[in-house]
Amino acid sequence: MRRYIIASHHKLAYGLKDTVDFLTNGIKKIYDVNAYVEDGEKPIEEVVSELFASFDENDEVLVFADMMGGSVYQKFYPYMSDKVHVVCGINLPLTLALVLESEDTP
């Protein structure tokens, strides 16, 4: 199964996920990770770890990150593999294109 994670500083990930869900009628399960939103929130490392722990080891994961090399990107970098891909510089057209791509497409 292909999993989708949108990750960003502040609330960009929430807004992008909400818009993709609206335009696609929520046909895919998309997770959003919004870092550094409030004091006292769960550390992003913990959020990312728990999210990956909830996936099957055979799942393919596409992570959409806001900035290459940024602190959010760095939390996902250790998970990159043949099955975990991080796409940086996210925007709505790119995210829609990849989410709507067939899961059979490599």
For the regions a language model picked out, list residue spans one by one.
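N-terminal loops that bind phosphate or other acidic moieties
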Residues: 1-106
